[in-house]
Amino acid sequence: EALHLNEDEFQPDKEDMAANELGTMLHDVLEQFCRLHPSLEDGMTTASLQREIGEILDETFTRQYGSRPLMPLLLQKRSMEQRLNVYAEQHLEDLRNGWTCIAFEQSVENWRLGDFSLRFRIDRIDRHADGSLRVIDYKTGKTDSCEKKHLGTMKRPDALPLLSPALHPYTRRQKNGKAVHFRWKDLQLPLYVLWAMEEYCGRPTAAYYALPANPLDIGISAWDTLHDPQPGCDICALESARSWILELMRLIREGRGLITAEELGWDTPSYDVFKDLVSSSHETLQDLLGLNITPHLPF
């Protein structure tokens, strides 16, 4: 009670952290650290920042796991220390290069896109001395580039109207003239950028900040081409993403779009929220959800 902790927060007998718990702790430490050091100050050194971020980790870790944690937890803490030391060094370099952190764990409530009200949280937003902005999402494991994580090639672009006639592939033309069609398999960063455009104006870029266990893989992976039409494209990637966001939300609201990845020629998802609930028959799934399927879907 004196520490204002509930029993779920203080876990001195816990053996180790799950991946999501480790990620949450890293997020908490980074938020506290960036609030203390959002911009360049006189006397900043790599050593001083590493010392401070280490102290924040010590306090956060002890508050949750006590002063005598088990060995697996100590090893995980050591892994976090290594990652945060690299982060502190890179943070100072970013500040010296003109970047300033202007928002941390930014909560967005009731933002309207089209007819929809959305809410989400953005890990970090930076502004450069030249006025440019970047929206950052932390990744505590090794991750693909922003573009590879968000876009997947389509083997059967002609099947996309089965999901919705309003959805169109994002198409780019290679140097040899061959058109390559992509679908949006993730829309997180484009959504954040669309909000930031309204909130701050300008043309914000997006980035992942990867913090995996291997220190050599820690760093920012920027997505600088969201706003720029690529050769052979009618629209830029961001406008394509906007149209997909709006149409997919309509599909969900109207109960449309119950079609499998296989029928669209897409890779099978690594998880399926329905697999333990119903059989694979469309009829059973429709009955479970009480949805009316629109005529253009093939069942």
Regions found by a protein language model. Name each.
Residues 1-299:
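RecB-family 4Fe-4S metal-dependent nuclease core
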